[in-house]
């Protein structure tokens, strides 16, 4: 599992195009998932798309 450093979080979208970045409630690093996946485990119930990053 590849982690994303905090330094990169501010600048570079951490996921592949077409996917979204979910910040798990118990973690500071983002995980990437399909936009159609549930966001129940994501902070603020949000999975951030590349356009919204």
From Swiss-Prot:
Q: Which GO terms describe its cellular component?
A: extracellular region
Output the superkingdom of the source species: Eukaryota
Give the chief site where it resides.
Answer: secreted
List the propeptide region positions: 1-6
Q: Where is this protein found? A: Secreted
Provide the free-text tissue specificity comment from this protein's UniProt record.
Expressed by the venom duct.
Task: Name the Gene Ontology molecular function terms of this record.
Answer: ion channel regulator activity; toxin activity
Q: Write the record's keywords in alphabetical order, separated by commas.
A: Disulfide bond, Ion channel impairing toxin, Neurotoxin, Secreted, Toxin
- What is the official name of this protein in its record? Conotoxin Cal9.2e
Q: Which species?
A: Californiconus californicus (California cone)
